[in-house]
Amino acid sequence: PPKPPSPMFATYSPKTQDLLQRLNAFFDQHIYPNEARHHAELDALRRAGDVWQPMALIDELKVKARAAGLWNMFLPHAYKGQGGISNLDYAPLCEVMGRVSWSGEVFNCSAPDTGNMETLERYGTDAQKEQWLEPLLDGRIRSAFLMTEPAVASSDATNIQCSIVRDGDDYVINGTKWWSSGAGDPRCALYIVMGKTDPDG
């Protein structure tokens, strides 16, 4: 079995060892050899003034990652045959993906989508899962996470000022967000907004 990427844990489950072996092989075959191409594609997008446009390389490698069974590895609960590993098991996979900053998207394991998908999988209604989770898991859309606000230190969620008030069958959201991860991506179709439904809480 492959050696763990760090001494953080003494042993990994057989499933994680298998995923680690296949992930390292994928990096050797497809990620490391394409770092120069990724840099060139990103540079071209920068020169064109739109770094958020999808990259041909990433789209090509997504197909290969899915075929290799290295897709949606982050899900802590199995959902329709995907994911089903613990955070402990996912940690060494993150270490490998962290070696190349852009690789997470290749495996549909990049923020903010991962956290948003976990939220939908755990708390979403069946209708929300069908409308948003399924396309996210399939990699057809991207999502954004709106937490940071200009007037408060909102990395501490208790400081958030954005209010969410029930109005009949609707909710009224009132607030200002910025630095909204993922919002610039043209494939972004879902925004998860952090706000307070209880202004005193």
Language model segments and positions:
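Amphipathic, small/basic residue-rich leader segments at the start of a protein or domain
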Residues: 3-110, 127-142
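Short loop segments at secondary-structure junctions
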Residues: 97, 123-125, 167-169, 196-200
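N-terminal glycine-rich flavin-associated loop
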Residues: 107-127, 156
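Adenylate-forming
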Residues: 116-120, 146, 189-193
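Short Pro/Gly-enriched beta-strand edge/turn motifs at strand-loop
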Residues: 142-149, 176
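Active-site-adjacent elements of ketosynthase-type condensing enzymes
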Residues: 151-160
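A short core secondary-structure module
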Residues: 170, 174-201
